[in-house]
Amino acid sequence: VIFLIILLMASLSLVGLSIKGATAKASQETFKNITNSFSMQINRRVNQGTPRGAGNIKGEDIKKITENKAIESYVKRINAIGDLTGYELIETPDTKKNLTPDRAKHFGSSLMITGVNDSSKEDKFVSGSYKLVEGEHLTNDDKDKILMHKDLAAKHGWKVGDKVKLDSNVYDADNEKGAKETVEVTIKGLFDGHNKSAVTYSQELYENTAITDIHTAAKLYGYTEDT
């Protein structure tokens, strides 16, 4: 099962699936300048989605949709959690206050991952919340690649071209298969952007989010791009 958002482009058309929180707000900004668009979501009367409330459209179904000749291009998205095992995240005084010993043990190095096949059309980049400041955007041909926040990279001395490892998190509710995967990814680019309001947990900070290719995000949950 793939957890995602699809953007179908016909003169830059967009289809969004399971848009939540800040992503939903960014997506609303995106829609302002997009025409010929329509949206699709799972039917929550018969499909409640993932434990954390995301959609779960299968990759094989996406393929059927995108075979329509009227669709010029598309963007699909997978939300995941990936651990930078052994490395600390960016913290603020507020997030430190909420970092209990139990949370630190289970999620102390957990990045919020968005897997996407075209990062230039990812909501937060389109809305301006994120800005690529070094390197290149992810494309459909990328595999084992990541875009990382420049502040997190600077904290650990990482630069474009360096390799880092992401581990599955067995405590993540959406890791329903209990996957224990490790994916070595190459930093393809660095982005900037900061929250405009206070946050409770470190994973809500833009600095602790990352964009990867679809393959990487899916593998962290024990899936492939098509399942």
Predicted regions and their residues:
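Alpha-helical transmembrane segments
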Residues: A10-Q41
